[in-house]
A protein has these predicted regions:
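A short, N-terminal "cap"/entry segment at the start of jelly-roll beta-barrel domains
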Residues: 1-42, 123-130
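Double-stranded beta-helix
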Residues: 3-6, 97, 101-130
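Conserved short histidine dyad/triad with adjacent acidic residue
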Residues: 27-31, 38-61, 92-95
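Solvent-exposed residues in well-ordered beta-strands and their adjoining turns
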Residues: 51-53, 76, 111-113
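Glycine- and acidic-residue-biased ligand/ion/polar-headgroup-sensing regions
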Residues: 62-77
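Short acidic-glycine-tyrosine-enriched beta hairpin
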Residues: 77-97
């Protein structure tokens, strides 16, 4: 990950224009990318974008509480169809994927805190326990 903040306790404001200007970094499967908005130690908050027709393969975070808020589009996640405005909590050890992405793709805000090991790059973690 590039340009990751690691400044717990410091004020940070990303305007909509700042976030729009951040590059999407490809992770894992084709059509899946993310932007890290904030990171301190092992806590990460970011955005994930999944293009129409793409999917985020099933994976599991054995030691991480995973929170997701869908900001755009629709998809299937943990056996449910969710759309913009939906919130999903995924406890540690629960397999999850993003499938059946709507025609406009989907985008979601995520946060998680790995509890078992330091956070590596998305490429190292993709599809593997965190």
């Amino acid at each position: 990950m590039t340009d990751v903040r690691n400044d717990l306790g410091h004020l940070l404001v990303h305007t909509a224009a700042d976030i729009a200007a951040m590059p999407w970094e490809p992770i894992g499967a084709d059509g899946v990318a993310h932007k890290v908005l904030w990171q301190s130690g092992d806590v990460v908050i970011g955005l994930i974008s999944v293009a129409a027709g793409a999917s985020k393969p099933e994976h599991v975070h054995l030691g991480a509480h995973h929170h997701i808020y869908l900001t755009r589009g629709s998809c299937d996640m943990v056996g449910r169809t969710v759309d913009a405005g939906s919130y999903v909590y995924i406890p540690p050890g629960v397999p999850h994927a993003v499938d059946n992405v709507g025609p406009d793709g989907c985008e979601f805000l995520y946060t998680y805190r790995p509890l078992e090991q330091p956070l590596g790059t998305a490429e190292e973690e993709w599809g593997n326990p965190v």
